[in-house]
Amino acid sequence: MKTRIVSSVTTTLLLGSILMNPVAGAADSDINIKTGTTDIGSNTTVKTGDLVTYDKENGMHKKVFYSFIDDKNHNKKLLVIRTKGTIAGQYRVYSEEGANKSGLAWPSAFKVQLQLPDNEVAQISDYYPRNSIDTKEYMSTLTYGFNGNVTGDDTGKIGGLIGANVSIGHTLKYVQPDFKTILESPTDKKVGWKVIFNNMVNQNWGPYDRDSWNPVYGNQLFMKTRNGSMKAADNFLDPNKASSLLSSGFSPDFATVITMDRKASKQQTNIDVIYERVRDDYQLHWTSTNWKGTNTKDKWTDRSSERYKIDWEKEEMTN
């Protein structure tokens, strides 16, 4: 099931000009993820598969890799769900009011959330990244230590033995120039990450953020010139001079660990995977002497939700 939520202020012009923007390509590292069943020793196997969903209307490509870890020496089964794909940026002009005023919709945040219904026996036991991330790049290799726990090695080592642990075939990696990752209040039933805009240098000026303000020029985050003789729609910063996430979108790479009691009477679980894009409204207008910018936060939210079914006995995940 795919759903879409757009706040009531969304205009018809915005829907027509932005939502049909094609989805950016998925990360090429997907080809390195091995599917099938692997014996990692100590009476333990890892079974990996993948599921792909395209939501063209919202510009979202969801690719979910899942790995069942069956350790016969442990009383719980484990499932690692890795959420990848691309959430398109959709940075573009959406309105023009003559030559002196224009609006730009731009992605101020990207979100990925996983939710188990409250009545499910299964629980979320871990997640990666486990903390907020403010570096440009995040990388972590997931390993299993034959103790019922999956851990992440942030040094990014790939494959084989890592200390006393064994790689389960997943090295998380994503980039977020000018953005930062915030872990959103995880519980045993839900976890989410918000990759939110931090600040950006505009043509060697700034840095500017969503709240920057100058008494004369206002917010200059996406202002190409202060006094240029041009239409307002032509005075927005070129996408290739801004963060790549604005034009190309964000390619998430998060992991969630779910545990299930082997003795539970019901060995099936439902889980919802939700991708979101939040957009701000950046406006430019001519004051008679110069350009002035304003930024309205969180004006539009685009949401795509998919329910997956987990079969712990068959070690399968379907949608």
From Swiss-Prot:
Alpha-toxin binds to the membrane of eukaryotic cells (particularly red blood cells, RBC) forming pores, resulting in hemolysis, with the release of low-molecular weight molecules leading to eventual osmotic RBC lysis. Human RBCs bind much less alpha-toxin than do rabbit RBCs. Heptamer oligomerization and pore formation is required for lytic activity. It comes from the Bacteria. Changing residue 74 to L: 7% of normal hemolytic activity, reduced toxicity in mice. Belongs to the aerolysin family. Self-assembles to first form a non-lytic oligomeric intermediate, and then, a mushroom-shaped homoheptamer structure of 100 Angstroms in length and up to 100 Angstroms in diameter. Interacts with human ADAM10; this interaction is required for toxin pore formation, disruption of focal adhesions, and hly-mediated cytotoxicity. The keyword Thylakoid does not apply. It comes from Staphylococcus aureus. This is Alpha-hemolysin. Changing residue 61 to I/L/P/R/S/T: No oligomerization nor hemolytic activity, wild-type target cell-binding. Its main location: secreted. Pfam families: Leukocidin (PF07968). Changing residue 74 to I/R/T: No oligomerization, altered hemolysis, near wild-type target cell binding. Residues 1-26 form the signal peptide. GO terms for biological process: cytolysis in another organism. GO terms for cellular component: extracellular region. The mushroom-shaped heptamer is composed of a cap domain (comprising 7 beta sandwiches and the amino latches of each protomer), 7 rim regions whose protruding strands may interact with the membrane bilayer, and the stem domain (52 Angstroms in length, 26 Angstroms in diameter) which forms the transmembrane pore. It is found in: Secreted. SUPFAM superfamilies: Leukocidin-like. InterPro entries: Aerolysin/haemolysin_CS, Bi-component_toxin_staph, Leukocidin/Hemolysin_toxin, Leukocidin/porin_MspA_sf. Keywords: Cytolysis, Hemolysis, Secreted, Signal, Toxin, Virulence. GO terms for molecular function: identical protein binding; toxin activity. The keyword Secreted applies.
